[in-house]
Amino acid sequence: MRTLWIMAVLLVGVEGHLMQFETLIMKVAGRSGVWYYGSYGCFCGAGGQGRPQDASDRCCFVHDCCYGKVNGCDPKKDFYTYSEENGAIVCGGDDPCKKEICECDKDAAICFRDNKDTYDNKYWFFPAKNCQEESEPC
């Protein structure tokens, strides 16, 4: 029951473009980003510190770094445009900043897909106390 409540809170907290990120993860990786990566390892979900625990957690670390390089728009709230061409996600639109957000999300979704086999349930709702090591630079 506690897990369902936490997932409901995570879903309510998803704003603007973060729902687009969820959609991209579903399209590319074939699984729910909120469910699988909403609170995984040291970097998936809110915040992020320490060292990535596995390749899936590293996808989130790289995604956080990518968002950190975006200037001129809000990666968590602004909407972007994309299309699907021959099964591939193609980021579009006239706004280079929003296109950057899309590229960050697309790369993370591909990373999740390519690292599904590294996903380990022991990192789901991983305690923050286990993420105290110094973070590596982006």
From Swiss-Prot:
It comes from Craspedocephalus gramineus (Bamboo pit viper). One of its GO terms (molecular function) is phospholipid binding. Residues 1-16 form the signal peptide. Binds 1 Ca(2+) ion. The lineage of its organism: Eukaryota, Metazoa, Chordata, Craniata, Vertebrata. Coiled coil: none annotated. PANTHER family: PHOSPHOLIPASE A2 FAMILY MEMBER (PTHR11716), PHOSPHOLIPASE A2, MEMBRANE ASSOCIATED (PTHR11716:SF9). Ca(2+) binds at F43, G45, G47, D64. It catalyses: a 1,2-diacyl-sn-glycero-3-phosphocholine + H2O = a 1-acyl-sn-glycero-3-phosphocholine + a fatty acid + H(+). GO terms for biological process: arachidonate secretion; lipid catabolic process; negative regulation of T cell proliferation; phospholipid metabolic process. Its cofactor is Ca(2+). This is Acidic phospholipase A2 1. CDD domains: PLA2c.
